[in-house]
Amino acid sequence: MTPATIRPLQDTDRAAWLGLRQALWMGSDATTLAAEAGTLLSEPQRFGALFYHVLLALDGERAVGFVEVSLRDDVDGFGGRVVGYVEGVYVEPRHQRRGLGRALLDAATQWTRERGAPELTSDVLPDNPESLAFHERSGFRRIEHRASRGKQQTLLTRPTS
């Protein structure tokens, strides 16, 4: 386990966070990702989220990973119950396999629990077996396969208690 720090996003972290977002969603336009990030923080309801939160993993003063987590009442299979939802999680390749991703998910789970939601959920595309294995190692279990936005996905959940 690395001695990295996990903490909420601060205004001074925005450029680093945007760079990490672009690394995760490589096929996306940087301008679009930046605009989306601003809206996520100021108006999460526009993206269907009740609340939105970003946590960073820092190696010293440098951001090397993040998790974006929201509270949602529109996740399929949960009957309108509010659950935490991992919108994205990323750790720079050279910092992977040091426990940072798990620490980010643990912090997202704690944030979700503190807001009264019983579960943290996530989804993974079938062409990403590394992410599926990472989620399962981090305490998530598969609950269903579903189509969302024209793509098949595996929905996973992890209790917050």
What are the roles of these predicted feature ranges?
Residues 105, 129, 152:
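Short glycine/proline-centered loop/turn elements that form peptide/ligand docking sites
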Residues 3-5:
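Extreme N-terminal starter segment of soluble prokaryotic enzymes
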Residues 74, 121-124, 136, 141-158:
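Conserved catalytic-core motifs of GNAT/GCN5-like acyltransferases
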Residues 91, 97-110, 136-137:
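Conserved acetyl-CoA-binding loop-helix of GNAT-fold acetyltransferases
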Residues 102, 114, 126-144:
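Conserved active-site alpha-helix within GNAT-family acetyltransferase domains
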Residues 112-124:
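Conserved GNAT acetyl-CoA-binding A-motif
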Residues 8-15, 19-81, 85-88, 92, ...:
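Acetyl-CoA-dependent GNAT
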